[in-house]
Amino acid sequence: MKGSPVSRPDFRSRLGAILSAVATDLVTEHRFVELEASEPPWLDTGLHVEAGDLVTVVLAGRVFFDQAADLWLDPSVQVWTRVGGHGPIERGSRATNTFRCANSGTVELGNAAPAEWVDRDGRITTDPGLYAFMTGGTTVGLIRWAHGVDPAGALRDLAAAGDVENLLMAEADRLD
């Protein structure tokens, strides 16, 4: 892919300002994690969830195959999630995704390229050393919704107060 998305620091600053103003009756916890392209799967985010919790993932960044040629992979196809060291692994079809946690534990993030998943738990057979050749990375915003909150409605309300590259509204639309 080619192009110039929002910078990772700008994304973190803008989304952080929006989420910092949210009441705890909507969002139980939010955090940001830097997932560098050179990091093999799986990175523990420290966000603890219970089975059944709803989590929204919001992504910004680029993973470069060739930075000089500006050839990069969009985070929507690069970043995968799982909970507690077990599958199912999943990702969204865009730079946002909301999922219901199948397990209790911490949310983990995995870079896909250059790996190929061999099972639903996210094991790889690729040499983890190959990740050292990748550059760039993804800033990942994680939102753990309070029990009983409708993420689509909450995301619409957040987007009305301020959005980052229309990511919050796009996820609300996807959920509806």
Region annotations inferred by a language model:
Residues 3-176:
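Gly-Asp-aromatic-enriched flexible segments
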